[in-house]
Amino acid sequence: MNLIKMSDIDLSGKRVLIREDLNVPIKDGMITSDQRLQAALPTIKSALDNGAAVIVLSHLGRPEEGKYEKKFSLEPVADYLRKNLEYPVRFVKDYLSGVDVKPGELVVCENVRFNPGEKANDEALAKKLANLCDVFVMDAFGTAHRAQASTYGVAQYAPVAVAGPLLIRELEALNQVLKAPKKPIVAIVGGAKVSSKLSLLKQLVGMVDVLIPGGGIANTFLKAQGFEIGISLYEPDLLDEARHILILAKEKGCQIPLPTDVVVGKTFSETCPAFNKSLSNVAEDDMILDIGPETIRDYVDLIHEANTIIWNGPVGVFEFPQFAYGTRAIAIAIAESDAFSIAGGGDTLAAVDLYDLNQQISYISTGGGAFLECLEGKTLPAVAILQERAKHVKTN
């Protein structure tokens, strides 16, 4: 990878602006999952250990741009970092006109999405952010697919722009899957909609040996094959696309196994009774909410044969315990496998957290959209600008 790394630069005494992805779930002012914070801490600590004056940027949630909303404030994140770092930590709301920060000190800036022009990559905003630093470090893989002021624009105008350790780790893990994967490769792609993962599914059939669809995606494939799926979630306008993917998979030698039995309910609720049914017995008023025990066994066997595993999305409504058996079994099978495994996407990470399997997956990606776009073979804008800056440095 043609990138300058943070570790290549002498940070001592320099103002170092780090873009992290600290977009964590917060309920009643409390952080409910610190996974992204734990992933970012080593980068921040390394910069501080090396004598830098550190400023951290991040977004949180989806506020109306340019408008302050307390529930989207990064103040709880600053409190968390204060408790988890042995360095002074300050939280600053107004930072665009400059930040007073000393070596060995961390300043956490308020949500970048409170700034008008962030999403549109406004040039004036990007230049103000760039003026805060001597070195810009892009470490937020989760937002690397967005060309925004705090991810792309600032990297254009900062005196030096480099890749952070977390970003490098993410790209290296994905390269292991994309460039030289050990076969057979099994991909599990779950979630509600085929439409949101259409490009990914088409890309994967030409790359993997087995593609296991789950959730609403599997329902669309089942309906496309003429199976009764009752009132289950599916996308009627994508049935032809699903058929095309099945034909494409056959041409490419990619197996797409579909459920032979399912777990159904009559309503989408936590208290809804669950019933195992063979696919041929699904009724008109049934809702498919998980895979059945026979399908679980088949999928687990396929996972155990893999040397590389890609996991994005649950195979059932795992938030409801009676419909969680499929996702749990898949997660445990991946964790128990000796294969190189990479997992990404919000729901996937929630499942990994729920079943306490963080240490047993080879690599857990902090990215959702960025993870998918990498798997689709797309170039991430925030990585592209770092590569461009690296080229420029090397020719001077």
UniProtKB/Swiss-Prot annotation:
Substrate binds at residues 21-23, 36, 59-62, 113, 146. The gene is pgk. Its main location: cytoplasm. The keyword Transferase applies. Belongs to the phosphoglycerate kinase family. GO terms for molecular function: ADP binding; ATP binding; phosphoglycerate kinase activity. One of its GO terms (cellular component) is cytosol. Its EC number is 2.7.2.3. It is an enzyme of class 2 (transferase). Monomer. This is Phosphoglycerate kinase. It comes from Legionella pneumophila (strain Paris).
